[in-house]
Amino acid sequence: MPLTLERIAQAIADHEPAHYELHANTKQAAVAVILKQCDDHTEALFILRASHEGDPWSGHMAFPGGHRDPGDKQLRQTAERETLEEIGLDLGRDGRFLGEIDAVHANPRGRNLDLVVTPFVYLLENVEAKFTPNDEVADVLWGSLNDMYSGDSITVGEFKIRGERHRYSGYAVGGQVVWGLTYRMLDHFFGMLDPDWEPHDAF
């Protein structure tokens, strides 16, 4: 069954998102999963993070987003603020909010980090919107959700972590590999759309 926007919107509306228990030291972050319809398939927007010393997600493919600021009354506000800052896209003007999906606990390799990331899903209604990436973003790319869901874009990525090379399953998008935290978010997303869906493994 194809991943149409109608199917995605209905699944999100019917879904009760899972949350993690927050402790005193738990940090919160939010990302925007931005979708657009392209003829016979649905695409999602990804950013390639610029390389910065000390950033555990430096150089990774990700959804736009970041840490919750004290001034953010809601986590959804965090996702929208960070998207505007990172790629210049005003989701309140150019997008339509579809809903919240399951939160994911971040565990970057080799780091002890209590961080919970909540994804919020949007439809990009203004397909002519221009992106103006800031210095945290090296590129903005669109990837086919249908190819990820079906496993057609599954691949193996090789990454250097603390001086050692590791290989992980991921999705190929625009010459890059979506892996790690964002890969896990997508697996949660596909599992929400289809309870019988099983994660793909490139090995």
Where are these regions (language model features)?
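Active-site/pore-lining binding-face segments in mid-to-C-terminal subdomains
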Residues: 151
